[in-house]
C-alpha cells in the first residue's frame, strides 16, 4: 500500500498571505449588480437600495477587496454616465453584453456599498474606446481634493472628501478578440504605459495593474504578457491574470486535475516577468493580480445564445449556475494554488460575487442562496509542505 508523507514546519515559509487574496469582482453583467447587490424595491433593501441580506453575506465571507465596474463592460463604459442625479443619468447600450444599462448604480453608489461591506475597491479604467485623458479625469474625480473641474464635480454630487482609491486596473482583457477596442500587445502596452504615467502624476501613491493574457489557453500567451511588461514594467505594479475552468462533463479526475494547469500557468508567467526584469536590469519584482478566477460551468456558446434570445433588456438573467460539490473542490484547489504563490500573487478576485459563477445567488424580489466557498479567515503565512 502506497503512503504519502507530508512534512509541515513553520520555517518553510513562502511569504505572508496578503489579505487582498480574498477579494471578489462586480461587473455590470446580467444580474450581478441589479437585483444582485442593488434592488431598491426588494424587501431586504436598505435606505440606499442595497440588499442588506447580501451585505451581511459579504461580511460573513470577509471579502477584503472588490474589483469594479468590469470586466468586458468597462471597455465601452463612460464613468460620467453613472454619477450625479439619478434621474438625469442616461440609459445606454451595453455593447459587451447586449443589454440596456440604466446607470442607476455607478461610482458613488459602489463606494457607498464598499464602505458598508468594509471592502477595498479596485477600479478599472476604459482603455477600449477611451484612453489617457479619460482615465486622468476619472482619477481626478475620485482622488483629488478640490479646486479642479472633476474634483469639484464630485463635491457637487455630495461627496466632499476624495475617496483615495489606491488600486487601478488599466483596461480589461485587451488581448481578447471579444473585447471592445481590442488591441495588439504593442498597442495596448503603449497606451497603458502612457495612461499609467499620467495617473501617477496625479496620485503617485496609486498601484497600477496592467492586462496580462485573458486565459493561459490564448494563442498569444505568453508573448502578449512579455511585450506588455516590456513596455509597462517601469509604471506597472501588478500584471493581471485571469483563469476560469469548466469541463465537468470530462469526468471528475480530469475536471479536478485542472488546478495543475493553473499552477503551471503561474510558474510560467513568473518566469516571463523575471526575463523582463533582467532585460531592464530592474530591482523591482513584478507582482501579480489574479483579479478574475473561478469555476464557470456555463459554456460560452450557451451564454451567447441566452443573450441572442433576449437582447437589449435591463439586467437579464444570463450565465447563472448553481455550484456542485465537484465545483467547490476545484474552487478550493485553485485557491490553494494562489496561496502557494503568495510571494508573487498579492491580489485575487473570485469572479463573480453574485449570480454568475457566484457564491451568492439572489432571487429578484425575494431572498438568496449562499454557499460559503471561501473566507479570508486564513493563516498569516503560506508554507511549503
Stretch-by-stretch model annotation:
Residues 119, 206, 286, 345-346:
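A structural micro-motif
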Residues 321-325, 360-368:
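Active-site rim elements
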Residues 185-334:
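Noncatalytic carbohydrate-binding groove/subsite architecture in carbohydrate-active enzymes
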Residues 327, 331-356:
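Substrate-binding cleft of secreted/luminal carbohydrate-active enzymes
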Residues 125-127, 349-355, 360-362:
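Acidic carboxylate-rich catalytic motifs and surrounding loops in phosphoryl-/glycosyl-chemistry enzymes
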Residues 2-246, 250, 267:
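N-terminal catalytic cores of secreted or lumenal carbohydrate-active enzymes
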Residues 374-381:
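Conserved small/polar residues in nucleotide/adenosyl-binding loops
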Amino acid at each position: 500500500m502506497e503512503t504519502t508523507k507530508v512534512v509541515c514546519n513553520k520555517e518553510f515559509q513562502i511569504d505572508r498571505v496578503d489579505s487582498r487574496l480574498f477579494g471578489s469582482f462586480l461587473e455590470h453583467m446580467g444580474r450581478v449588480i441589479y437585483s444582485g447587490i442593488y434592488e431598491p424595491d426588494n424587501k431586504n433593501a436598505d435606505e440606499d437600495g442595497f440588499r442588506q441580506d447580501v451585505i451581511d453575506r459579504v461580511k460573513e465571507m470577509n471579502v477584503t477587496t472588490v474589483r469594479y465596474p468590469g470586466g468586458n463592460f468597462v471597455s465601452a463604459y463612460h464613468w460620467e454616465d453613472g454619477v450625479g442625479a439619478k434621474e438625469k443619468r442616461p440609459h445606454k447600450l451595453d455593447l459587451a453584453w447586449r443589454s440596456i444599462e440604466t446607470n442607476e448604480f455607478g461610482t458613488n453608489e459602489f463606494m457607498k456599498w464598499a464602505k458598508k461591506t468594509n471592502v477595498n475597491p479596485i477600479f478599472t479604467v476604459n482603455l477600449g474606446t477611451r484612453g489617457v485623458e479619460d482615465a486622468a479625469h476619472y482619477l481626478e474625480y475620485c482622488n483629488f481634493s478640490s479646486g479642479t473641474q472633476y474634483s469639484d464635480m464630485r463635491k457637487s454630487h455630495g461627496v466632499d472628501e476624495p475617496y483615495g482609491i489606491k488600486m487601478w486596473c488599466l483596461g480589461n482583457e485587451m488581448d481578447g478578440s471579444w473585447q471592445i477596442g481590442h488591441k495588439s500587445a504593442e498597442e495596448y502596452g503603449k497606451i497603458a504605459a502612457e495612461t499609467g504615467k499620467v495617473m501617477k502624476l496625479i496620485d503617485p501613491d496609486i498601484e497600477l495593474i496592467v492586462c496580462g493574457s485573458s486565459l493561459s489557453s490564448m494563442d498569444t500567451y505568453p508573448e502578449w504578457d512579455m511585450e506588455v511588461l516590456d513596455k509597462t514594467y517601469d509604471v506597472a505594479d501588478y500584471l493581471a491574470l485571469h483563469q476560469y475552468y469548466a469541463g465537468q462533463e470530462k469526468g471528475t479526475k480530469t475536471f479536478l486535475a485542472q488546478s495543475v494547469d493553473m499552477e503551471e500557468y503561474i510558474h510560467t508567467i513568473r518566469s516571463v516577468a523575471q526575463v523582463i526584469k533582467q532585460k531592464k536590469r530592474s530591482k523591482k519584482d513584478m507582482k501579480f493580480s489574479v483579479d478574475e478566477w473561478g469555476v464557470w460551468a456555463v459554456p460560452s456558446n450557451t451564454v451567447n445564445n441566452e443573450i441572442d434570445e433576449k437582447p437589449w433588456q435591463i439586467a437579464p438573467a444570463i450565465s447563472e449556475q448553481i455550484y456542485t460539490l465537484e465545483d467547490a473542490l476545484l474552487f478550493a484547489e485553485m485557491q490553494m494554488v494562489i496561496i502557494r504563490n503568495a510571494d508573487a500573487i498579492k491580489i485575487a478576485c473570485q469572479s463573480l460575487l453574485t449570480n454568475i459563477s457566484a457564491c451568492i445567488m439572489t432571487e429578484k424580489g425575494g431572498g438568496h442562496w449562499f454557499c460559503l466557498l471561501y473566507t479570508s479567515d486564513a493563516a498569516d503565512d503560506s508554507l511549503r509542505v
